[in-house]
Amino acid sequence: MATIKEIKELLVTVKELESPIFLELEKDNRSGVQKEISKRKRAIQAELDENLRLESMLSYEKELYKQGLTLIAGIDEVGRGPLAGPVVAAAVILPKNCKIKGLNDSKKIPKKKHLEIFQAVQDQALSIGIGIIDNQVIDQVNIYEATKLAMQEAISQLSPQPEHLLIDAMKLDLPISQTSIIKGDANSLSIAAASIVAKVTRDELMKEYDQQFPGYDFATNAGYGTAKHLEGLTKLGVTPIHRTSFEPVKSLVLGKKES
């Protein structure tokens, strides 16, 4: 009779819920064997569910494949809302029908998984472009226009250039056909890939800024207006990376000028 360890090793090779191996092993009434069978079935079901989820996030891409297009770039940005730091956009062209396990809207990916999935995108993407627009430009042109500039910069770095753009809730003035998708990072794998690249890139930048400007907790809050960040603003004042067109930074700058 096979040991439970041997059965566990055998079950790892089973990829289908209908496998005859399950039928055979279910005759073994040892509780340890039954536990391993249940565990493996749950793992297979989870893989099937994940594959279906990824498949559903390729619906926009598949419509474009039918038109003969394969160089499809997903575009997304991170950092429209913070009080400090740049807005960062990424453009990513994935291979046809590429499915990266765990890839999703970056806001739905556990933080501990960010780097792993970022690396998987880096490894599998045909091309990646990153656009970074700093706080000074944001203050000059407004955050909406700055976001478009970041996206255009990211797209310009792609090689080969894309045949079509899938963009998260925005239209760009570019001579490339494009589709604007509401909640695109949750509905398109290409946009989700851009989302995680932009997120990790910006988070790393804000960690560097945390070293340059301690006291604002940038490494944790990424420039968003958390209690620690606002406390830092009150105690230490405005840094060169703060957006002076955003409140409460704007009022602090005006108050300093008037005093």
UniProtKB/Swiss-Prot annotation:
Binding note for cofactor: Manganese or magnesium. Binds 1 divalent metal ion per monomer in the absence of substrate. May bind a second metal ion after substrate binding.
Top-rank taxon, per record: Bacteria
Subcellular location(s) of the protein: Cytoplasm
Pfam families: RNase_HII
Positions of transmembrane segments: none
EC number: 3.1.26.4
GO molecular function, one term: RNA-DNA hybrid ribonuclease activity
GO biological process terms on file: DNA replication, removal of RNA primer; mismatch repair
Ranges of residues in domain RNase H type-2: 70-258
Signal peptide: none
GO cellular component, one term: cytoplasm
Catalysed reactions listed for this entry: Endonucleolytic cleavage to 5'-phosphomonoester
Binding positions for a divalent metal cation per the UniProt entry: 76-77, 168
Cofactor names: Mn(2+); Mg(2+)
UniProt entry keywords in alphabetical sequence: Cytoplasm, Endonuclease, Hydrolase, Manganese, Metal-binding, Nuclease
Role played: Endonuclease that specifically degrades the RNA of RNA-DNA hybrids.
HAMAP family from the UniProt entry: RNase_HII_B
Family: Belongs to the RNase HII family.
Protein name as catalogued: Ribonuclease HII
